[in-house]
Every structure is written in structure tokens, then in C-alpha cells.
């Protein structure tokens, strides 16, 4: 088998390699973001019901994020382990990691979708759905859950394509699905008059197409890492390794859901318009966060592969370029949204009151995210280097240790503004802490690898 795609991770010029590996993931995640953003844009502009429907979809996002988070155990934990195994020349272990990951995704689908179906309405009420929004929330989520397996495959297996140096394939899968979603949304929502149900159906169909492309590649002869029947049998040691490293990406994603529970619950007491405001602002925040997640998926295989081979100079160089790119993008994107909040809000709604509310709250909500690019880079580096414990702590720090308590405490002193301000304070504090931890440990980690 021709391993040129794998070998270039250890030999190609670094900056062009990072761009070649990361930009497809960046573009793919930016386009993938359209799955949720386009739904919200079209739903928010439905005449007469747009604001309530938007709040209903915002409530479901906490559950959807939690379900999708389980795929990060496989994608976020398994792909770096597979890259390290490839770097060490251990192909047998790399194949086994992928096979066990595939089996876990099927198990996660059955468990998460089943539990959600059974307890759907109580969960939505708990998160903050009101009498005015519960119908839209259940309509959307009921359809979305039928495509859980497709979402798991599309998000959990994509990283294994990047791990073997083929980011273009994963980008194609996401782009095709996203373009299909953009076309189906207005057709189902407006032409067929299906409303929020149509938006969910468009997403399910689009994710199914992406999943078929990804799985199709991973079972083909073009793949270095392949899904093979003999590797689907659970291996307790490998599954343990997946959980050990993947628990940090899982917590990063799942605590986003927990944050949604807390924020939506707090805001529901002030009125549905504040829940809709949060939905708009979180969507805007994703314009910076989600594409950079795709960028990180591109440079993580480079770091993992070279760390496995002991090429620590290339690890350092990859970090240098990556942190500059990620910090700059995060800062510029957030500054734009803070400066023009009402313009951003107008993308999602025609409701004047909602646009003005977003205009007041957006600076409070996003200011701390301006330096978050530092944390996102350092956190991804820890995952790439197999530092599960540090990654786990950082994942817990921002959302569980800082954001959730702040979101519960600050409103007692600042009212509804305190709910939004909690995000900025937590983001800035955790970014500073994470960068400090990375500065103190990075050299030690690489030095230890050089001595083995």
C-alpha cells in the first residue's frame, strides 16, 4: 500500500503541511456549522412564530450537543491514538483502534437516542422549554433522533480520515452534506410547509449522505486505516485507551450541553426572548469556535505522528504556527461580532426587540472569547500529545469549575446580564490558566519523549 499520505506528516515543509492538513478541516467545519446555523436562520424568519420556534430549537441544542459529544470519545480520543500508532509503525493497533471506535459509536447511538426518546419532554422542560416553545422543540428533536447513527459516524469517524493524512476526503463529505442541507431547508420548511420538522428532516438526510461517504472511504482500498470486521470485536484495553484520552474532548463537548442546561434554565425565568437571544449569540460564537475545531483536527495528526516518531522539533514548529493562526482568527472574528452585534442578529431574525436585546448583550457574552484561541490551541496540543489528565482538567476548568458557578451566582447581583457575563469571565480566566499550564509543561513533555 502507498503510504505517501502518512509519510508526509513527518517530512513535508511545516507551514504548507499545516495549511494543507488544517484548511480542509477548517473549511469543512465552517460549512458543517451551516447545518445548525442554516436551520436557525430559516426558522427564525418563519412569519409569526419565528422567535418562539428559534427559542425551541435553542433548547434542543443542549440535548443534541450531549448526544454528539459521545462521538468525541471515538474521534477525539481514537484518532490521535491511531496517529501515534502509525508514527510508531504499529498498524495492527491503529486498525484495532478504528474498529473498536466504530463499534462504540453504534452502542452510543442505541443508548443515547433511546433514553432521549423516553424522557424527551421532561428533559426539554428541565432545560427551559416553555408552553410556547415545547411544541417546536419536540417536533424538531423527534425527527433529529432518527438520524443519530449518521451524526455519530459523520462526527466520530471523520478524524480517522485526517489521521491518515487525507483531510480532503473528510472535507468533501462535509461539504456535500452541508450543501444538500442548505438546499433542502427552504424546500421542506417553506415550500412543503413542514416548519421545524422540515428543518430536522433536512439535517438528517444531509448527515446520512456525509456518513455514507466517510464510511465508504474507510472500508475502501484507498484507506491506510480501514474498517475491517475482525477489528470490530471489543478489546477492553483499547476501549479503555479510547476513554482515557477521549474523555477530555467528550467533557469539552458534553459540558457545553450542561452549560446550555444552566444558561437556558436561568434565562427562562426572565422570558423566552432571552432564551432566543442566547440561541443567536451561541450561534454567532460558533462562527469562531467550530471552524477552529476543524483547524485543530488538521494539526493534531501532525503533532501526534511526529511525537510518536520522536521528531520533537517538528512538534514545536507545528505549535508555533498553529497558535499564531488560531489566536489571530479567534480575536478578529470576535472583535467583529462585538462591534456589529445587531448586524449579526439580523441574520437570524426580523424581530426588532430580539435584535436590540442581542445588541445589548453580545459584548458582555463574547468579550472573553477574544483570547480563547490560546486555550483552544494548547488544549488540542495536550490531546495530540496523549496528555489525557491535563486535557481533562482544562476541559473541566472552563465550564464546570468556572462558567456554571458564575452563571448561577452573577445573576443574583447583576440580573439577566450576569448570565451572559459569566461566559466572558470564564473564557478569559480559563484561557490564561491553560496557557500558563502549557508553558510550564510543554518542554518537559517533549524532553521526556526525547529521552525514550
Model-assigned labels for residue ranges:
Residues 1-22, 82-149, 191-247, 303-368, ...:
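Short alpha-helical transmembrane segments in multi-pass integral membrane proteins
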Residues 11, 15-34, 38, 63-70, ...:
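Residue-level signal for short hydrophobic patches within transmembrane helices
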Residues 20-39, 143, 177, 206-210, ...:
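Transmembrane helical elements of multi-pass membrane transporters/channels
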Residues 30, 34-55, 124-131, 187-194, ...:
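Helix-terminus/linker motif at the lipid-water interface of multi-pass membrane proteins
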Residues 37-41, 114, 122, 156-160, ...:
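Alpha-helical transmembrane segments of multipass membrane proteins
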Residues 40, 51-54, 91, 120, ...:
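Membrane-helix interface/capping residues of multi-pass secondary transporters
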Residues 54-114, 151-170, 264, 277-335, ...:
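Small-residue-rich hydrophobic transmembrane alpha-helices
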Residues 75, 144-162, 170-178, 199-214, ...:
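Short runs within selected transmembrane alpha-helices of multi-pass transporters and secretion channels
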Amino acid at each position: 500500500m502507498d503510504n505517501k499520505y502518512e509519510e508526509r506528516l513527518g517530512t513535508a515543509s511545516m507551514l504548507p503541511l499545516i495549511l494543507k492538513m488544517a484548511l480542509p478541516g477548517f473549511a469543512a467545519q465552517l460549512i458543517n456549522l451551516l447545518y445548525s446555523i442554516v436551520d436557525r436562520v430559516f426558522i427564525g424568519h418563519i412569519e409569526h412564530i419565528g422567535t418562539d420556534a428559534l427559542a425551541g430549537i435553542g433548547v434542543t441544542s443542549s440535548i443534541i450537543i450531549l448526544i454528539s459529544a459521545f462521538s468525541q470519545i471515538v474521534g477525539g480520543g481514537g484518532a490521535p491514538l491511531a496517529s501515534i500508532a502509525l508514527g510508531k509503525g504499529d498498524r495492527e493497533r491503529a486498525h484495532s483502534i478504528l474498529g473498536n471506535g466504530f463499534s462504540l459509536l453504534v452502542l452510543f447511538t442505541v443508548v443515547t437516542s433511546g433514553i432521549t426518546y423516553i424522557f424527551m419532554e421532561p428533559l426539554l422542560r428541565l432545560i427551559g422549554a416553555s408552553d410556547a416553545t415545547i411544541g417546536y422543540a419536540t417536533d424538531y428533536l423527534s425527527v433529529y433522533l432518527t438520524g443519530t447513527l449518521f451524526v455519530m459516524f459523520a462526527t466520530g469517524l471523520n478524524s480517522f480520515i485526517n489521521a491518515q493524512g487525507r483531510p480532503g476526503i473528510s472535507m468533501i463529505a462535509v461539504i456535500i452534506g452541508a450543501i444538500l442541507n442548505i438546499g433542502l431547508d427552504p424546500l421542506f420548511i417553506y415550500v412543503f410547509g413542514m416548519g421545524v420538522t422540515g428543518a430536522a428532516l433536512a439535517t438528517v438526510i444531509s448527515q446520512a449522505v456525509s456518513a455514507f461517504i466517510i464510511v465508504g472511504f474507510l472500508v475502501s482500498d484507498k484507506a491506510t486505516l480501514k474498517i475491517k470486521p475482525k477489528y470490530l470485536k471489543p478489546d477492553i484495553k483499547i476501549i479503555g485507551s479510547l476513554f482515557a484520552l477521549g474523555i477530555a474532548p467528550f467533557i469539552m463537548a458534553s459540558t457545553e450541553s450542561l452549560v446550555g442546561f444552566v444558561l437556558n434554565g436561568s434565562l427562562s425565568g426572565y422570558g423566552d426572548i432571552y432564551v432566543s437571544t442566547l440561541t443567536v449569540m451561541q450561534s454567532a460564537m460558533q462562527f469562531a469556535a467550530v471552524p477552529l475545531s476543524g483547524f485543530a483536527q488538521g494539526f493534531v495528526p501532525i503533532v501526534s505522528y511526529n511525537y510518536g516518531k520522536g521528531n520533537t522539533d517538528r512538534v514545536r514548529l507545528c505549535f508555533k504556527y498553529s497558535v499564531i493562526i488560531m489566536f489571530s482568527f479567534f480575536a478578529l472574528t470576535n472583535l467583529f461580532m462585538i462591534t456589529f452585534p445587531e448586524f449579526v442578529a439580523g441574520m437570524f431574525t426580523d424581530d426588532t426587540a430580539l435584535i436590540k436585546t442581542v445588541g445589548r448583550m453580545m459584548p458582555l457574552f463574547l468579550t472573553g472569547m477574544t483570547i480563547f484561541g490560546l486555550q483552544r490551541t494548547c488544549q488540542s496540543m495536550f490531546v495530540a500529545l496523549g496528555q489525557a489528565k491535563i486535557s481533562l482538567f482544562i476541559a473541566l476548568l472552563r465550564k464546570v469549575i468556572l462558567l456554571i458557578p458564575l452563571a448561577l451566582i452573577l445573576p443574583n447581583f447583576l440580573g439577566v446580564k450576569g448570565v451572559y457575563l459569566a461566559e466572558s469571565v470564564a473564557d478569559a480566566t480559563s484561557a490564561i490558566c491553560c496557557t500558563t499550564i502549557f508553558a510550564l509543561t510543554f518542554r518537559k513533555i517533549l524532553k521526556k519523549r526525547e529521552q525514550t
